[in-house]
Amino acid sequence: MKVRASVKKMCDKCRVIRRRGRVMVICSANPKHKQRQG
C-alpha cells in the first residue's frame, strides 16, 4: 500500500474507489498498484 498525495491508475485494471472518505486505488492484476490518498 502506497500513501500518496495524488493517486492515479497505474494500469487499466486499477479501480479508483472511496472508502471512509479516503480515495484509494485497488488493482486485481498487480497488488503493488494499491494506493491510498492522504
From Swiss-Prot:
Keywords (A to Z) from UniProt: Ribonucleoprotein, Ribosomal protein
Gene Ontology molecular function, alphabetical: structural constituent of ribosome
Cystine pairings recorded for this chain: none
Annotated InterPro entries: Ribosomal_bL36 (IPR000473), Ribosomal_bL36_sp (IPR035977)
GO biological process, alphabetically ordered: translation
PROSITE patterns: RIBOSOMAL_L36
Lineage top rank: taxon: Bacteria
Gene Ontology CC terms, in alphabetical order: cytoplasm; ribonucleoprotein complex; ribosome
Signal peptide limits: none
Cross-referenced Pfam families: Ribosomal_L36
The keyword Ribonucleoprotein appears for this protein: yes
Listed HAMAP family: Ribosomal_bL36
Family to which this protein belongs: Belongs to the bacterial ribosomal protein bL36 family.
UniProt-recorded name of the protein: Large ribosomal subunit protein bL36
Species in which this protein is naturally found: Synechocystis sp. (strain ATCC 27184 / PCC 6803 / Kazusa)
